[in-house]
């Protein structure tokens, strides 16, 4: 009995505990302090045995997930800590052994994955140009620098360095093999006694890795395998090196979580957005199909340099006699009617990688503890559940290394005894008869005699009979595995995996790549390429019209039948047909690569060296200026060498006829004239139209190189997509070329260009009448062109076009400009009439199945023809200047449908109309404008200035007043506070060409889209709510009624503000849309102002794992806002008012339009414009899908503006002329001019022209 302590005054007794100096193995477990005494029981003292140490180690590996690919070689395998013999002596149970094997499998799985990853990093490191080894040459792994490292090496130097590195590895391999042979010979001489090998009693104690090769540690094995793979790869590099490997560092610039597989997929070398821009965000539709070519414009898909060993699923060295015997013994027992109970028999269960195998502990499932194999054998083939088979399934390619002797690792004394012979490691079922307690005490060195073969007969229908001879056994088992693999490959599971997430991220199988190519071939050709070709053709081609009657149609049908084996020629329909002809004057204006992108880390790279190919003899000391001069001379020489194409001899066939087609788009003509056959006397069109010889009458063949050059200049590349992106802008010339200066001077004269003033339109109509009279006289003297003359247009269609036509149901309906016949409605806006023909207008809904805009069509977009800037190829790095519009957005903004006034800046000063009139500079005369554009410098934003200037003075005053109110409401929200969107600019137009350096900043797409989505979901930020607040602030009632803390205007402006809402204030947000809420009491000023001034903290919803890339802390750009439901009536102007304050930074209207189109595309939203107003392009409404217009919204009729459109000859033009273009716009926008203002410009007020005054009066009367 314990004696109470004398110091225990409370009567409590101390507990007796063991001293701290005692051995750890006898230390007691922690106990609760309770009253009274308690004796220590033997069960409380648990010594730390071998199995507890191993269990803790396995718990770190399996459950706590402390082991991964990075540290898998630092953690020891459980079998490396203690041998199986030690575990047997510690009386380990079969359950504990199962856990040990599971931990060993997990470690091996990570090591194999790390091995494959390191080997495949060899060729992926080629693109970065840097490959290094550890300072210690004996280290196993390669050290690969980050792909975002600086570029210090050209591609050729990187290739040579890589080959040298592999050669050194080959030398190390030879040395290792020689040393291994010497050690082996010495050991065999020592161990062989009387010609017989000595039995190794500890053969089973090594890690599973070691059973592939005896007497080799796992580290050496992994190193040897790496050397072997690298040697094979070196041979592939010498023979199959890709021509499209480039050294840029944008290989993994992917922003969509749905295509994360592309970052580490072993079948692609790299994937970029189609441009060598290092600072731009990419869009996944451009990245899906592969890498970019050296010129940066063409996305090309090609196979990665294949690791041939990656597809090896079966190693013959893994098949041994003991493995065959173990398999036979397990199958025999499991198929027996009364199988012997193998306590807690473990079945391999494949889980998610990188865990190769996981042993299922049957004892934890009481209901299935009896006869686990006998029950399952009645349902499915057990051959697929064997250890060997599970290690050779195609879905687990990395298991081959560990698949040699999994069964031989089972303990020999726990129901599965193993023989101790070096080549005989079989399971003896007869030895299961003794109870398990007696089997524990058996020695590991007991001899085992294989029972008679008759006792182990296998079910023939399962795997067939296995012969006794070892060689025949190996061959039979190999055939069995091959059959199982063939069945797996021919099943439907493979195809379903390919398209589960675009492409599965696991290791590719043998046929996966071919299946992917076959499935993506048709959508890629018919969808993307067709969309690009059709868009380019509809925008920039000339239109040729031809009537086809029944006789001509039947003749064409007969010709098609007489052609080759099948009806392969496409013929037009009966009636009027329109064809697109390539134009020499108007070509696609999609920007090419920007030379500034070749500047990395403020260091100009040598462009010639970067794409020098495989020629490693190029000089490294050639200055950049010399290379640029050589390029200029070559381009000039090519222009000189190009001989003009002579007109075709139409009289060669014996019959004289003229084809009278205009070289450019024809001027407006009468309707009856359009009904006839258009002819053309320019023979070059025949060659462009037919793309081949016409009746073999052309005198001289064109140079093939020149033809190829023209094709590259005309069309968009195959995989370039007109997608909205957020990247850097295209380069623009510092000064205009001769062609561009001539075009600027002759705007509205030579062609039916955009923004044609009424005066010029009258002159053009008069010229058109004269041209029509001349054409009639010429037609009367010549024979008209017939369908037979165009027979070469309906050529024999190549196979790739047939494939596109076959897959039309799955892909786009538009495949090729020469296999697509357009209707008149597709080319011309039906509301205008033929006489007021725009260049091209088409319905975006026709492209709905092309794969790009598959969720939402944005209505009609009118495309504008822009003359090709042939001097683009002369731009170099020192001439490039900053421009913050993105590539594709800039391309879309060149179309008039997206051309509107952006980012209006406030005009400070009095709000009265008289002061506003004096603050606006008066326009200058036309004569001065013509002289002004003769200078070497010009305004690159002339057309956008003209668009805003033609809004009219009344509209300008309204917008200026609104801007001043907004500036007074939010005095702290100014672009200077946030430093501008790009850090050094207060205005989006502050990108003058005379600025020396502008650092572009990537827009956070996810943040913008999330902010837009929240605004759209908030009714208090809708257009009526903001309009109501503006009205209250204007009448100065809000400060008195609600006692808000909004900062009031200055005293000098407060006196001039009217006491009641003015007409201009009412029109601030309703200049285009006339909307009045039925009940204004629903609008709360405090709530709206709080929402306007609130700056939410956009944080990520959940943390992403390290292996998943993300473009932003706010989520991914394309998956963040998939579900957006609009509350309220939101317009572009209301969004432009709300976003800057909530974002805490300057937001450009062009960015709002870009991201809003993305959200509309993802959520099937509507974008509505009121074209009855002349300023309809300055605003639009965003509505939910299938949602009707708001009740208080009044929409006009476009017919009310018919007279105005006819006078301007352009559906998108806005009132005004070119005479009041630049000064009004620059004052309204408050931006620095790109061109210095000449003295005297706007000094004297010029009266408005009579035509402009008439239009202004007409608008005032309407409103």
UniProtKB/Swiss-Prot annotation:
Region (Disordered) spans which residues? 1-29, 1098-1118, 1225-1263
Subcellular localization: Nucleus; Chromosome
Gene inactivation phenotype reads: Results in larval lethality in XX hermaphrodites; survivors exhibit shorter and stouter body morphology and are egg-laying defective. Male animals are viable. Higher percentage of spontaneous males through X chromosome non-disjunction. Disrupts protein stability of dpy-27. Disrupts localization of dpy-28 and of capg-1 to the hermaphrodite X-chromosome. RNAi-mediated knockdown results in chromosome segregation defects in mitosis and meiosis. In a sex-1 mutant background, leads to high embryonic lethality.
Q: What is its main location?
A: nucleus
- Tissue expression, per UniProt? Expressed in embryos and in somatic and germline tissues in L4 stage larvae (at protein level).
Keyword Cell inner membrane recorded: no
* Coiled-coil features, chain-numbered ranges: 691-725
Quaternary organization: Component of the condensin I complex, which contains the mix-1/SMC2 and smc-4/SMC4 heterodimer, and three non SMC subunits that probably regulate the complex: dpy-26, capg-1 and dpy-28. Within the complex, interacts with dpy-28, mix-1, smc-4 and capg-1. Component of the dosage compensation complex, which consists of the condensin I-like components mix-1/SMC2 and dpy-27/SMC4, and the three non SMC subunits dpy-26, capg-1 and dpy-28. Within the complex, interacts with dpy-27, dpy-28, mix-1 and capg-1. The interaction with dpy-27 is required for dpy-27 protein stability. Interacts with smcl-1.
Name the record gives this protein:
Condensin complex subunit dpy-26
Where does this protein come from, organism-wise?
A: Caenorhabditis elegans
């Amino acid at each position: 009995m314990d004696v109470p302590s004398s110091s225990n005054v409370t009567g409590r007794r101390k507990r007796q505990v063991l001293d701290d100096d005692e051995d750890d193995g006898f230390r007691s477990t922690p106990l609760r302090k309770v009253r009274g005494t308690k004796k220590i029981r033997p069960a409380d003292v648990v010594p730390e045995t071998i199995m507890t140490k191993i269990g803790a180690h396995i718990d770190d590996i399996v459950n706590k997930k402390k082991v991964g690919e990075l540290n898998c070689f630092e953690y020891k395998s459980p079998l490396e800590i203690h041998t199986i013999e030690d575990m047997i002596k510690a009386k380990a149970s079969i359950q504990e052994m199962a856990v040990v094997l599971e931990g060993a499998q997990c470690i091996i799985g990570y090591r194999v994955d790390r091995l494959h990853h390191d080997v495949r990093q060899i060729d992926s490191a080629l693109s970065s140009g840097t490959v290094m080894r550890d300072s210690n040459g004996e280290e196993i792994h390669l050290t690969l620098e980050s792909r975002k490292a600086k570029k210090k090496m050209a591609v050729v130097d990187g290739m040579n360095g890589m080959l040298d590195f592999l050669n050194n590895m080959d030398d190390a391999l030879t040395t290792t093999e020689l040393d291994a042979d010497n050690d082996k010979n010495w050991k065999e001489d020592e161990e062989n006694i009387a010609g017989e090998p000595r039995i190794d009693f500890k053969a089973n104690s090594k890690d599973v890795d070691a059973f592939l090769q005896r007497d080799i540690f796992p580290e050496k094995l992994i190193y040897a395998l790496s050397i072997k793979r690298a040697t094979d790869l070196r041979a592939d590099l010498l023979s199959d090196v890709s021509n499209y490997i480039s050294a840029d560092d944008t290989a993994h610039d992917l922003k969509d979580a749905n295509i994360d597989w592309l970052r580490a997929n072993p079948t692609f070398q790299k994937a970029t957005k189609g441009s060598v821009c290092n600072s731009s965000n990419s869009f996944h539709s451009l990245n899906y199909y592969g890498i970019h070519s050296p010129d940066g414009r063409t996305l090309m898909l090609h196979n990665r340099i294949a690791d041939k060993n990656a597809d090896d699923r079966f190693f013959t060295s893994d098949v041994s006699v003991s493995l065959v015997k173990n398999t036979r013994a397990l199958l025999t027992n499991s198929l027996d009617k009364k199988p012997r109970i193998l306590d807690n028999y473990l079945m391999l269960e494949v889980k998610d990688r990188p865990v190769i195998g996981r042993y299922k502990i049957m004892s934890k499932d009481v209901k299935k503890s009896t006869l686990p194999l006998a029950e399952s054998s009645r349902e499915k083939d057990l051959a697929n559940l064997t250890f060997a088979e599970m290690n050779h399934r195609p879905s687990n390619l990395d298991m081959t290394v560990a698949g040699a002797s999994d069964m031989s690792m089972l303990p020999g004394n726990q129901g599965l005894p193993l023989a101790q012979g070096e080549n005989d490691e079989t399971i003896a079922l007869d030895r299961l008869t003794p109870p398990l307690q007696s089997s524990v005490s058996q020695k590991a060195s007991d001899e085992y005699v294989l029972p008679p073969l008759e006792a182990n007969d296998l079910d023939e229908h399962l795997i067939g009979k296995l012969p006794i001879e070892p060689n025949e056994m190996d061959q039979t088992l190999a055939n069995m595995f091959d059959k199982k693999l063939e069945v797996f490959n021919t099943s439907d599971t493979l195809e379903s995996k390919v398209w589960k997430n675009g492409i599965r991220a696991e290791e590719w199988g043998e046929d996966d790549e071919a299946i992917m190519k076959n499935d993506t071939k048709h959508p890629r050709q018919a969808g993307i390429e067709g969309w690009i070709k059709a868009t380019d053709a509809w925008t920039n081609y000339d239109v040729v019209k031809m009537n086809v009657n029944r006789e001509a149609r039947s003749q064409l049908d007969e010709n098609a039948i007489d052609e080759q084996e099948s009806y392969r020629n496409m013929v037009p329909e009966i009636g009027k047909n329109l064809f697109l002809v390539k134009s020499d004057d108007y070509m696609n204006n999609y920007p090419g690569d920007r030379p500034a992108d070749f500047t990395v880390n403020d260091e100009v790279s040598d462009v010639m060296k970067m794409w020098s190919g495989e020629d490693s003899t190029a000089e490294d000391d050639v200055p950049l200026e010399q290379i640029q001069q050589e390029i200029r001379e070559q381009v000039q020489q090519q222009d000189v060498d190009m001989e003009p194409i002579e007109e075709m001899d139409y009289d060669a066939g014996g019959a004289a006829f003229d084809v009278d087609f205009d070289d450019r788009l024809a001027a407006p003509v009468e309707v009856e004239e359009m009904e006839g056959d258009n002819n053309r006397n320019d023979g070059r069109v025949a060659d462009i139209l037919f793309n081949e010889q016409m009746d073999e009458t052309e005198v001289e063949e064109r140079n093939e190189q020149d033809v190829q050059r023209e094709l590259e200049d005309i069309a968009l590349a195959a995989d370039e997509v007109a997608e909205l992106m957020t990247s850097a802008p295209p380069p623009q010339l510092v000064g205009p070329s001769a062609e561009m200066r001539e075009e600027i001077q002759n705007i509205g004269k030579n062609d039916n260009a955009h923004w044609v003033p009424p005066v010029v339109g009258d002159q053009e109509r008069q010229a058109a009448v004269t041209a029509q009279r001349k054409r009639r006289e010429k037609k009367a003297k010549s024979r008209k062109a017939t369908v037979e003359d165009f027979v070469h247009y309906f050529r024999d269609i190549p196979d790739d076009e047939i494939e596109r036509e076959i897959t039309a149901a799955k892909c786009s309906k538009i495949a090729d400009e020469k296999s697509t016949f357009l209707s008149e409605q597709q080319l011309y806006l039906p509301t205008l009439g033929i006489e007021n023909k725009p260049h091209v207008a088409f319905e975006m809904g026709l492209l709905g199945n092309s794969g790009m805009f598959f969720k939402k069509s944005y209505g009609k977009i009118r495309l504008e023809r822009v003359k090709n800037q042939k001097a683009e190829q002369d731009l170099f790095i020192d001439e490039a200047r900053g421009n913050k519009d993105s590539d594709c957005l800039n391309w879309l903004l060149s179309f008039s449908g997206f051309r509107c006034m952006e980012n209006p800046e406030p005009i400070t000063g009095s709000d009265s109309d008289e002061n506003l009139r004096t603050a606006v500079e008066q326009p200058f005369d036309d004569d001065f404008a013509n002289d002004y554009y003769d200078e070497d410098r010009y305004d690159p934003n002339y057309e956008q200035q003209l668009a805003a200037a033609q809004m009219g003075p009344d509209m300008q005053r309204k917008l200026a007043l609104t801007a001043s109110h907004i500036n007074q409401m939010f005095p702290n929200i100014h672009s200077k506070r946030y430093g501008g969107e790009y850090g050094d600019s207060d205005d989006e137009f502050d990108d003058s060409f005379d600025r020396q350096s502008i650092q572009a900043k990537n827009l956070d797409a996810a943040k913008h889209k999330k902010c837009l989505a929240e605004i759209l979901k908030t009714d208090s930020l809708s257009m009526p709510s903001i309009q109501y607040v503006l009205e209250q602030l204007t009448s100065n009632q809000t400060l008195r009624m609600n006692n808000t803390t909004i900062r009031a205007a200055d005293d000098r402006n407060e006196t001039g503000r009217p006491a009641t809402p003015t007409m201009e204030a009412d029109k601030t947000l309703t200049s285009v849309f006339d909307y009045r809420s039925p009940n204004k009491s629903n609008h709360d000023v405090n709530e709206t102002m709080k929402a306007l001034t609130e700056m939410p903290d956009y944080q990520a919803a959940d943390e992403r794992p390290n292996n998943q890339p993300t473009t932003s802390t706010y989520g991914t750009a394309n998956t963040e806002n998939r579900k957006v439901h609009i509350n309220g009536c939101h317009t572009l102007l209301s969004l432009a008012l709300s976003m800057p304050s909530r974002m805490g930074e300057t937001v450009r209207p062009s960015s709002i339009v870009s991201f809003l189109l993305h959200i509309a595309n993802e959520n099937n939203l509507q974008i509505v414009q009121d074209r009855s107003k002349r300023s309809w392009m300055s605003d639009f409404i965003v509505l939910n899908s299938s949602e009707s217009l708001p009740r208080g919204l009044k929409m006009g009729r476009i017919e009310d503006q018919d007279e105005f459109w006819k006078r301007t000859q352009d559906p998108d033009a806005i009132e005004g002329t070119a005479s009041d273009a630049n000064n009004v716009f620059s004052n309204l926008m408050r931006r620095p001019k790109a061109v210095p203002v000449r003295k005297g410009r706007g000094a004297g007020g010029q009266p408005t022209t009579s035509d402009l005054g008439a239009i202004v009066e007409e608008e005032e009367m309407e409103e």
